[in-house]
Amino acid sequence: MWQEAMRRRRYLRDRSEEAAGGGDGLPRSRDWLYESYYCMSQQHPLIVFLLLIVMGSCLALLAVFFALGLEVEDHVAFLITVPTALAIFFAIFILVCIESVFKKLLRLFSLVIWICLVAMGYLFMCFGGTVSPWDQVSFFLFIIFVVYTMLPFNMRDAIIASVLTSSSHTIVLSVCLSATPGGKEHLVWQILANVIIFICGNLAGAYHKHLMELALQQTYQDTCNCIKSRIKLEFEKRQQERLLLSLLPAHIAMEMKAEIIQRLQGPKAGQMENTNNFHNLYVKRHTNVSILYADIVGFTRLASDCSPGELVHMLNELFGKFDQIAKENECMRIKILGDCYYCVSGLPISLPNHAKNCVKMGLDMCEAIKKVRDATGVDINMRVGVHSGNVLCGVIGLQKWQYDVWSHDVTLANHMEAGGVPGRVHISSVTLEHLNGAYKVEEGDGDIRDPYLKQHLVKTYFVINPKGERRSPQHLFRPRHTLDGAKMRASVRMTRYLESWGAAKPFAHLHHRDSMTTENGKISTTDVPMGQHNFQNRTLRTKSQKKRFEEELNERMIQAIDGINAQKQWLKSEDIQRISLLFYNKVLEKEYRATALPAFKYYVTCACLIFFCIFIVQILVLPKTSVLGISFGAAFLLLAFILFVCFAGQLLQCSKKASPLLMWLLKSSGIIANRPWPRISLTIITTAIILMMAVFNMFFLSDSEETIPPTANTTNTSFSASNNQVAILRAQNLFFLPYFIYSCILGLISCSVFLRVNYELKMLIMMVALVGYNTILLHTHAHVLGDYSQVLFERPGIWKDLKTMGSVSLSIFFITLLVLGRQNEYYCRLDFLWKNKFKKEREEIETMENLNRVLLENVLPAHVAEHFLARSLKNEELYHQSYDCVCVMFASIPDFKEFYTESDVNKEGLECLRLLNEIIADFDDLLSKPKFSGVEKIKTIGSTYMAATGLSAVPSQEHSQEPERQYMHIGTMVEFAFALVGKLDAINKHSFNDFKLRVGINHGPVIAGVIGAQKPQYDIWGNTVNVASRMDSTGVLDKIQVTEETSLVLQTLGYTCTCRGIINVKGKGDLKTYFVNTEMSRSLSQSNVAS
């Protein structure tokens, strides 16, 4: 098995290299794959079936020979020819069953089989009796038909072989019979009839081959599309899982994924959700965890000196390093708030050493910042606080999901950081108990620095770093970066140093197709770019992605080709029944039978062409009687009407007048193409007419034509030579009898041209026809055919005896057409199955793509999501953008802190969070309104809602806009704040609460960017953001506080503002602030809620 796999891989590689391009510069990989597909799916099974049919026919001929009791010495040539042919075909059959030999000697096998069949035909013609004009026409017609339909010739070679076959038969017969004395008056008509039969066989065979090749090409294309969709689906699923898991922990990600898929699948899922008045809450309680809060001291001052790119790079590198430290210490990063970082140990699986993990992480963070400070000379430090307890963790709201934690213990951990000291890890007494003496500590006195700690009587400690007393050699000298500090800004020194850490970029794995082949959805290490030294490798990977995709597609195609082997369709299939070829899925079977068939009119056309050939043949050889004219005239009118109805749609498009009759014909044409029952009815009528007309006039032979004295076979010597001559002359007048048999064969072929019509229907029609024809040949008209053969031949062989030749020929054609019909039915169903699978997988891909987009847009604004979804090398770089005018809003519910309690009644705070989830979800609902399409939710911080406007504008276009238009988004933000107030009032009425919203708004320049590879997060930074936050924290309940600059803009937009006065803002000094008119707020918010 492994040798075969290696052989296939070498074959794939070699052929792929050969297929890299042709003379016209186009890839040729599809050509050789299609050849292989065509070879194994069509050519191989058909040539196997042909050999089985021929060998079976040889055995049947031998059986018939001995059953008839013919003398061996009279038919030596027959007994030599048939067993020899049987041996040759059996040897070829053995070789054909060896796949490798078949592929190498495909053309040779085709040529040998064709030559052997032609040789058999001439041997049958020359031996067994006198040569007649109708001799072996059925056998050569069989050769012509199978050359097109079953031998693996291309169309050109098939035409050449068939023309040689038919022309050689015509020429040989003409030469032989022209040299024979007597009986030449009908020779020309018989030869012409033979030519018409051969032309009909060529046309039917070429038609069959052309349509089958088109169908196979379509099946191949559908197979390729399905495999491509499967590869893409696998990629999308892996990408979606990675994306989801990069945003949310696995234990809630799958629940939320199921809800999104339900939402994307349409109204049915929505109807189920409407029965619940509450939004789903994805929050769980976890006990015995430790929470770490860390703040970079001095970063605000450093950030004010940074360019947008430097700021985002620094944050990404710093927090990327912290994520790495968190992973090493079994901690989960929760969120990034500006320059604040917090994480938890003990989620989602409880860990006994959670406190040690957090303390170790805090020490490592301080050590990492110390290295940065020592290496760059930039005055930054780390303040870390750790507390242990219980948390509620999960996601709230409908948009911009961010995994978060809530509880009194989380609040305490936050204050542990605020009450800490730079460079130290500040822990609570609870955490100290969990450490079990693992670290030395000293008094922390946190209650002196933070009133919350003092109010709650929290005893705090500082952890003594075990490495603190062991100084590294670096402290003995100033690094080169510091020595050069006078020559470059601190931010430049920081950026250059942090680049050496090589933190992964956000969403770096989104479009790496080399991740497609990883197992179990694991991200390979090659997917994570580590620093700029990998840029060249990334470029090479991107250039080779298409080639790898082609290789994977080719490999999957080879596997599919292996699955579509000659024997596979006869074995058990998951989708198709073995014998009947019906689909196991009843719905699929119904859909298949109801499939529209626009090509049906061409089937009828080809059948009518065969009918016309039968008519020409019988006109050439039959006596010209009134019955002949009337019968074919009536049949012609019926078929012409059917043909007209089928083509009515195309014919009437040119007609300007639309009479009721024309409209009925046009409608009928569409019904025939689109509905199965009219097609079935017309198929039965058309084939029945042709099959009946093949033998109809045989029943109207005159008595003189039907009765022939058996003189040639009599032993009475009293008959004179003149009587024998009369008998022969009468027999010659019945020269048309074999052409009834050939007309029957053409009638059977007419059934096979209805390629996509029900296989069982065609089989039933041909079976009834075969039984009827054999009844005529062997019973009702047996004496006529038998007497005719005995008059012409003294001891006729099997192929000279009309009854035997007719019955055997019809049976061989019946089996051949049955095999072709079944083969065609199988691949038609396979094509339908592939299309159905492709359609379903296409829908699943679209769902996955939409899911990925929803997930990405749940983290990023739409225009930023497009940046990462775009397939370009720029995705490898960090996204950052600076804006000159962005309006930032912080809306908080201070009362919620008092409302939040942890008790058994409210499930330890879970029910409080359920209400908060409803509030945030209702706030998020407003974002879907068209008037608020420009509002971008940034994040929620506890019960505070942060949003911004002006982020969707192209920065370069900000200055080109008119002043009023430039500030329109600030008015939109105020309107949004009004709407939030109205939503909260509505929630208060339903929940019997009295929450008040406190809003702070500011506008100005900001820097936007995406940071973090583990959990990518879109955020905005800058003084504008800090002041907006202060506008909220220093604000008044039920008021919207804005800065003086923002109030001036709002007044130009028609809003009224009331001066609050001068207030002291932490870090900004004294600022003059304003309240937006709350009466306007109240009226507008109520109208928003009503709308």
UniProtKB/Swiss-Prot annotation:
Its main location: membrane. GO terms for molecular function: adenylate cyclase activity; adenylate cyclase binding; ATP binding; magnesium ion binding; manganese ion binding. InterPro entries: A/G_cyclase, A/G_cyclase_CS, AC_N, Adcy, Adcy_conserved_dom, Nucleotide_cyclase. One of its GO terms (cellular component) is dendrite. It is found in: Membrane; Cell membrane; Cytoplasm. It is a multi-pass membrane protein. ATP binds at residues 295-300, 337-339, 383, 939, 1019-1021, 1026-1030, 1066. This is Adenylate cyclase type 2. It comes from Homo sapiens (Human).
